Amino acid sequence: MVRSPPTDSVGLVTQHKATFEEPLPLVCGRELPRYELVYETYGELNREGTNAILVCHALSGNHHAAGYHSEHDRKPGWWETCIGPGKPLDTNRFFVVCSNNLGGCHGSTGPASINPETGKPYGDQFPIVTVRDWVRSQARLADELGIRQWAAVAGGSLGGMQAMQWAIDYPERLRHAIVIAAAPRLSAQNIGFNEVARQAIMSDPEFHGGRYYDYGVSPRRGLAVARMLGHITYLSDDAMRAKFGRDLRGDMSFDFEQVDFEVESYLRYQGQRFVQDFDANTYLLMTKALDYFDPAADHDDDFSAALAHIQCSTLLLSFSSDWRFAPARSREILRALLEHNKPVSYMEIEATQGHDAFLMPIQRYLEAFSAYMGNVAREVGA
């Protein structure tokens, strides 16, 4: 419970909802006739409208990036380390916006929303959405908020991919792209991880072909296993060794149902906690969006060509122990930008926390991020 938020927090926040009546054409060939985006904002938009920052969330994230919804919240938003007074995304200087992506399960239109054609939840009938679709919907949200150009679009992991897509699709609408712990596209290994996660969900007897809402159930076991698998990939071997080693919770049980090792207990806890407020169909959609992200596909498999016409400056940050999106993947982006003489700053940060390092209060990371954003603030008069 938070009785008084820390002084460097944005404090208590409220969510907003934008409704769009104009159909949204999707990359898959279908369209959403009407949709809603839930979002939060932190800080104030300046008179010139030049200090807006769009934050894009990763696979399991949502619009609640910072602050607290009530004094009873146990934890703040997912990027509390980076959003707030005096932090890299300084809300004394910037107006920060974060929305829940289409297909999400925290208020934006998604599989659990009512399909206007049937009067029932979309379920398996919700269209496949891509990073490009998300960016298009975010551009409409920017229009709704009166933001012609973002000072920066920022995100880690899948959020960083959205920042890249913004730079490609709307080059004139952002001054900076902040791409953290990301990649130009998924490797075969990463696609494989996502497929195993999807199979865990779809093989759960309670999945019912994605129509489980109609049965009043949820494929919780499959979703928990998917989350357990994902969580392993977000941590480094060093971090897991330091945190758990081979520590036992007690004597060996010689039983499959019992939990012997501390790491088993941790993963089961993460899985069970995750299923409390995340939807299985959304997990399927988010992993597919990750798999399909490939800007080079429209340019004869030439990623450099995909970035040829961007106009923004780019900050690339990677973490030494991240093996899901290793530093080598960020350097691929770096080389593609340099090939076209695009302004770019890059830093590989020594960190033991693995892929999830972008969410953590690592001093060198926050210093580098803050220094860059300080320059952005001065550039836009914030």
Swiss-Prot record:
Cysteine-cysteine disulfides: none
Site feature location: Important for acyl-CoA specificity: R324
Residue intervals passing through the bilayer: none
Keywords for this protein: Acyltransferase, Amino-acid biosynthesis, Cytoplasm, Methionine biosynthesis, Transferase
Main localization (coarse): cytoplasm
Catalytic residues, chain numbering: S157 (nucleophile), D322, H355
Assembly description: Homodimer.
Protein name: Homoserine O-succinyltransferase
Lineage: Bacteria, Pseudomonadati, Pseudomonadota, Gammaproteobacteria, Chromatiales
Protein's gene: metXS
